[in-house]
Structure formats: structure tokens, C-alpha cells
């Protein structure tokens, strides 16, 4: 799943260089959503993992 986030991030960066529009805007939106999802999962695993010792 992390590879998908990195793939969409690279597509979004290339799209930003070429100008946002069409599929570029969609890739940027997907990259933002995946970034937020992984950030939430990271924070959750950090706090729940601390209890295990």
C-alpha cells in the first residue's frame, strides 16, 4: 500500500511541473488522501505500539 502512495506522489509531482488539470488533478487528490491515511495509521500504530513495551 505504501508503494501506491509513493507512486501517486511521484505522479502528482510530475503533474505539478506540467500543470494541474485532468488526470494530474486526480492524481494529486489521491496522493493527498493516501498521505493523510498513512499519517493517521502511523500515529495510531505509534500510540498503540507503545503499550506493548
Swiss-Prot record:
Transmembrane spans: 4-24, 29-49
Membrane-topology descriptor: Multi-pass membrane protein
Location relative to the cell: Cell membrane
Keyword annotations of the record: Cell membrane, Membrane, Transmembrane, Transmembrane helix
Gene Ontology cellular component annotations, sorted alphabetically: plasma membrane
Transmembrane in keyword set: yes
Major location category of this protein: membrane
Protein family per UniProt: Belongs to the UPF0391 family.
NCBIfam families (UniProt xref): PRK13682.1-1 (NF010226), PRK13682.1-4 (NF010229)
HAMAP family according to UniProt: UPF0391
This protein's name: UPF0391 membrane protein PP_0135
Amino acid at each position: 500500500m505504501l508503494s501506491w502512495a509513493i507512486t501517486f506522489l511521484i505522479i502528482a509531482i510530475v503533474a505539478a511541473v506540467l500543470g494541474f488539470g485532468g488526470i494530474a488533478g486526480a492524481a494529486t487528490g489521491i496522493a493527498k488522501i493516501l498521505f493523510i491515511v498513512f499519517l493517521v495509521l502511523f500515529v495510531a500504530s505509534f500510540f498503540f505500539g507503545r503499550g506493548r513495551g
